[in-house]
């Protein structure tokens, strides 16, 4: 099988909801990260054969946002681009599709990743097509409807998390402890400057004022304690729930991208091989417990790689909810000391279309820093799916 290399891996800072990146669209963020990627590797834009980008919240964004990103980033007009939607796994699915394109010989050099502006998801008015002739009309939040709502059971993703708490007997205390740990790990990573290498600064217009350059993640709350988290009310099941705003991932804006090509092509161009992509898998599960999707996906990806879980040195697993991450860890029985060593989505944020690539970016850089040999990245996805990918240095 053809060895595929990641030669550059970058991301924007992650903005909080209606925060620093509120003036920017998903395409703005995607274009910024693609420009940053090309600058890092000093590769001419014309050398890129295709761009594949994940984005979940595309309502009102215009045709094929990935194509908009490609052209705004300076890729030639004859370079194709496609937008991918696997909900939270979109960014990682984009990477998987890029690998497949290169292995099939359909492309030589591909930029893959994801972008999302949850801050700018529009409201929808159903029924207006035929005219609202009398009475009231209601607006529907496209962020919730298209990104956070289970289409099969007609309830919020938070209820799927509550279902996991019930099924696996995971207490509120364990969830809060996990969330506080994620915040502490992220705070330590930021203080040590461990995200600097992977982040591309983003310039944000401020009208007549000079642009603001955002260089750091906006979401982390380093002062968070378990005692503070215990004071929060359940967000989705008020009477007896355990999932809160503090032990769940947040609403965010951001983008991430990787540059992929064959290992021999990278060496020919004098580009570094940060990691090789070994295998990947997507798996379906019951939508009502979508959070366990990574279990089957990880098992399949590891089997395809010929690895055992014990061989893996580092794991990046998206923290959609603390209870979801705990349930996956419980089922896979992985070593928690290897997982999200610099914090996860509960602390850093979860821009849903970008997170799949964001965890790859963070994993690659931490593998480099530690001299780790084998890595695993995985996410769950709304609608009952999981995706996983194995990397090797």
Describe the residue ranges of each PLM region:
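Conserved active-site "lid/cap" helical segment
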Residues: 1-61, 65-73, 80, 160-172, ...
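N-terminal extracellular/periplasmic Venus flytrap/periplasmic-binding protein-like
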Residues: 11-12, 23-27, 31, 40, ...
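Beta-strand segments within the central parallel beta-sheet cores of soluble alpha/beta enzyme folds
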Residues: 46-54, 80-85, 110-115, 176-181, ...
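Active-site pocket-lining segment
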Residues: 160-162, 198, 206, 278-347
